[in-house]
Amino acid sequence: MKRKCFIAVVLLLVGVGGWLLYYLSDQQVIKRTFTALAVSLSKDGEETPVMIALKMKPVKDFIAPACEVTVPERNYHEMLEPGLITHYLIAYRSRQANLHVALEEILVKIPSKGRGEVSALVHVTANYNQPDFFEETHRVMFSLQKQEKNWLLHKATLPDALVRR
């Protein structure tokens, strides 16, 4: 009886340990981070400046001190700081009455220790029930680097159609 109980406890511990390894793996952490950022970028109606600041803080914290932003169709290639990127995002959000951002098909590759490559489909829906309603899906690419146990965005490749709105 003690042996069966011991085996059950060991199997339970192995199962919990395996689940924790999966849940806390770098790939899953990155996917959860990107999903949370998509929620932060979404907007439902008017927002106070305090709400905007609270929503943009996780975005700003996720961006490296110098982030390379590339828009291949425009031959745009620039190194931007987190504050400037959040200002661009706030300006983009302010032009929309409401905005829903969802990341789908998030593919995470860890080519080497401390480096990550992310490819995702960004699904943007804005201005529902408005004359200027739009719904678009675009492929975006990101490069991440791990610094002090946190993943930071170092490079973003965005399509022109996503930037021009």
Segments (PLM) and residue ranges:
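Hydrophobic membrane-insertion alpha-helices, especially the h-region
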Residues: 5-20
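Short Lys/Arg-rich amphipathic alpha-helical segments
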Residues: 28-31, 44-48
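Short beta-strand edge/turn micro-motifs at domain boundaries
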Residues: 115-119, 131-165
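Surface-exposed, charged secondary-structure patches
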Residues: 84-130
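Short, solvent-exposed secondary-structure junction/capping segments
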Residues: 38, 57-76
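Cystatin/cathelin-like cysteine-protease inhibitor module
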Residues: 48-50, 115
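Ser/Thr/Pro/Gly-rich low-complexity linker/stalk segments immediately outside membranes or between
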Residues: 23-38
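N-terminal alpha-helical signal peptides/signal-anchor transmembrane segments
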Residues: 37-45
